[in-house]
Amino acid sequence: NLIFTTGAWTGKILPSYQNKLIPERQVMGWFDTQKSSMFLPKQFPVWTMLVPEGRFYGFPEFQSPGFKIGLYHHLFENVDPDELDRSLITEKDEQVLRNCVSEYFPDANNQMIHGKVCMFTNTPDEDFIVDRIPEFPQIIVAAGFSGHGFKFCSVIGEIVASLATESEIDLDIEMFRVSRF
């Protein structure tokens, strides 16, 4: 068996998956907290919130300076993973994040001290694909984790290992089947 866990490049490697796995540019920013203890892990959790401006997420200040914030589907920019400029953060990118910080986290509405560009790989329904390729059942695909697959790595690993070793899977994986598209 062959296992593809090629992230944003899966649609390029397996063209039949191009419309099922869409790489999207994502931007995160770290805003100066002025050393406020309010944004440290003991007082401030990892969070996500749905507000009229979108679905934001963030992290407390931990191991590097700044309160981290991002917006799911940042500017809705689908990208070619080979052509993404990971070094370019625009004024518009910063403004999208700053608007949220100023509205909901005013104590961190300071200088953006660091920014980072990455990719999320989304499926049309935003659920993962973990399945065999129907035309080539010896090939397994695990992709479309949209920046949060790491939270599920133990169970995804178990599913992929079961598929690869042709062992019985004790979990219902219908929601991850590629046939849903």
What residue ranges belong to the model's regions?
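Active-site substrate-recognition segment that forms the wall
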Residues: 4, 8-135
